[in-house]
């Protein structure tokens, strides 16, 4: 049994109601596999899932932006469990390409002593409230200089947030994603319940499927805080 306070940081997925496709098709088991015998009054089902790899709270592996990058099947499990630091930028304005407020390198350097090599970083932008609404892509953003510093100098293990992204909107080719993923650093998008955390430092579990060739995957994202 895990000791500590458990906080679920993932959105519950709703088939047919997500921005990125998620559909379920339900069959009785013997419809698909006749060798599975089933009496007419017995509930015994199998389901087909049609789902985007970027549905809901999800992790984007390096393969998403680097054709030679690690994918969901090859990314090391030990890098999906580890120490995480929560950075609060809820005071930054969430907006579109014209109104989004930047988070600059000097603002990140305030936390420099906490940002150790391999550390997981989770940014609270106060954007989980926009999930599933017309404002679902409104957010603040990190400057490219700040992302470059996290990737190349600080060598973080993972970068995540409660928004649909973290870099400046309207810039072609997502250069922030590219520099992270060229350095085998995955990204978490659309986390939730960051405001439920009582501590800034906790253990993060990123529970993704191990599927060869998959660029991203919906996750059960779990924080465990020391009691």
PLM feature segments, named:
Residues 1-227:
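Active-/binding-site microenvironments in catalytic and ligand-binding cores
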């Amino acid at each position: 049994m895990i000791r500590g306070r458990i906080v679920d940081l993932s959105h519950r997925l709703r088939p047919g109601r997500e921005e990125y496709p998620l559909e379920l098709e339900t069959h009785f088991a013997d419809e698909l596999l006749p060798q599975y015998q089933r009496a007419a009054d017995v509930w015994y089902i199998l389901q087909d899932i049609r789902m985007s790899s970027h549905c809901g709270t999800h992790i984007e592996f390096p393969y998403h932006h680097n054709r030679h990058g690690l994918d969901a099947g090859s990314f090391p499990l030990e890098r999906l469990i580890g120490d995480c630091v929560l950075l609060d930028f809820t005071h930054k304005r969430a907006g579109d390409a014209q109104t989004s407020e930047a988070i600059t390198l000097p603002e990140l350097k305030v936390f420099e002593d906490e940002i150790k090599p391999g550390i997981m970083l989770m940014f609270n932008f106060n954007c989980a409230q926009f999930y599933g609404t017309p404002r679902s892509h409104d957010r603040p953003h990190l400057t490219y200089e700040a992302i470059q510093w996290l990737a190349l100098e600080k060598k973080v293990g993972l970068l995540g947030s409660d928004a649909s992204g973290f870099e400046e909107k309207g810039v072609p080719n997502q250069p922030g994603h590219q520099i992270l993923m060229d350095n085998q650093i995955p990204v978490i998008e659309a986390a939730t319940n960051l405001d439920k955390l009582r501590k800034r430092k906790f253990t993060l579990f990123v529970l993704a499927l191990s599927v060869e060739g998959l660029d991203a995957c919906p996750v059960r994202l779990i924080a465990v805080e020391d009691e």
